[in-house]
Amino acid sequence: GRGHMTTLFASPRLFIATVDFNLEICPILVNAQEVRGCWITLDYCQEGRCEVAMPGESAIIVKPGDCCLSASRRLPSEYRYPLGRYRGIKLCFSDGVTNEPAYGVMREAGFSFGSWIEQLDPAVLFEGDDQLNALMASFEALVDPFDAPRSKLRFMEVLLHVKARGLPTGRRHSYYTKSHMRIARTTHDRLCADLGCDYRLRDIADSFGISVTSLNNYFQGVYGVPVPTYLRERRLQEAAKLLEVTDESVATIAARVGYANPSKFSAA
């Protein structure tokens, strides 16, 4: 895959990144030994979906319009983007950032990350918070060209907004266990390995010992749409690519991507 991440340090303990990736997995290039203390990350998803790792190989799935606040003393080994497409804004800061002179006003206000870190355990999801989304989106205009002073002010606005509204509580609707993630990923890989195969959801669900409804729920949670919708979209994408790069007939390409009847392919 391809893409780019622009990372800029507004201060020693705060960096801002704009992310635009067309890939599913991006390795972390920072040496874990370089990370000191507890680091807090706020991810704002604008397009695609991203995974935020949780204990036990589980994950929170961040979809467009969501912000995920997470804390960790260890960096993950990689970032994962289930749809192979992601665009977003990332703030990463140390729990000691407010000790820097630029953020003295936060200390005067008695701001502390201690209670946040206890509540995160290790992540929470803000869904549909338009004000927070607008604040996060505004960083795009501050990084090109980079405006460090205004970025620091905007960062403090973000912190004060989160402090005022409080961290989300209750059931995590976008939380998926290790088992859920394994089922969704295995199903995805099985489908994409041979788009021409005639798959039956009942057979796939039975192989995991779950219902078709559960299979679709897990898959949709990670990839955004139910299995049939995802498979149809991937088949059409592959067919469009083949039409561009080969001289094969529509009927031949239709069969290669799982449409034995060309008329059904045209209708799709």
Description of each model-found segment:
Residues 2-111:
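N-terminal regulatory/effector-sensing and dimerization cores
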Residues 88-98, 138-143, 199-214:
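Long, charge-rich low-complexity segments
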Residues 91, 96-159:
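Loop-centered beta-sheet repeat module
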Residues 114-128, 144-151, 159-189, 193, ...:
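Short, Lys/Arg-enriched, Trp-marked, Pro/Gly-tolerant hinge/linker segments that flank
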Residues 128-138, 171-199, 205-207, 232-248:
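A short, Lys/Arg-enriched amphipathic alpha-helix from helix-turn-helix/homeodomain DNA-binding modules
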Residues 161-167, 192, 197-234, 254-268:
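Basic/polar phosphate-binding segments, predominantly the helix-turn-helix DNA-binding elements
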Residues 243, 252-255:
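Active-site pocket scaffolds in enzymes
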Residues 248-249, 264:
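Residue-level recognition of oxygen-bearing side chains
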